[in-house]
Amino acid sequence: MIRLAAIVLVAFALAGCGSDRSTDNGAAPTTTSTSPPSMQTVPDCMAPPDASTSTKKSSANENRETMYLTSISDGSDKCSAKVLFGFEERAPGPGYEVSYRPAATAKVEDGSGNPVEIDGQAFLVVKLTPAMTAKIDGDQVMKTYTGPNRLPGTGPIAEVVKTGDFEGVVTWVIGFDREHPFTTDWSDSQLVVKIDYS
């Protein structure tokens, strides 16, 4: 009987040694987890560093050779709206001046000064010089641009309207919902006016 009692006591002692020590003080075991690294959102579209709403973009035609407008097209993509002014294939292209102007001076016809209706709240005026939309030879007039004088817009552009073809200056106005940064570039006989979404 004494030997049996001793065996039972040893069994209880071993059971006590095998218990979880982490619960000896009554505290629950602590678990830690590592949160996944946060994802930084990078915008799909960013305006180029030279884009601006306040800076006038201009280029002079040093040869003073008249350039003839042949087309206006839309080259927009998901990040920007583009208005392409196409000319006959001649270098270096017309002189141009592109800048935002108040409605009082933007929405008028060159020469006559008559008001021109243009949709939008901000107006980017594109002046091309020396440039024309037709070749004149005596009584003969051959139009090089036969498209519309008013084109529907896309994205932030409300519409594009011709406001002048007078004394070697061709003027178009791009109406916007507000002023957007823009850049200009001459490429492949086209003046590209690029308006970035921002």
How would you label these PLM feature ranges?
Residues 6-11:
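Hydrophobic helical h-region of N-terminal Sec-dependent signal peptides
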Residues 1-5:
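Bacterial N-terminal signal peptides that target proteins for export
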Residues 13-16:
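C-terminal motif of bacterial Sec signal peptides marking the signal peptidase cleavage site
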Residues 18-198:
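Short linear recognition/processing motifs and adjacent strand/loop elements at protein termini
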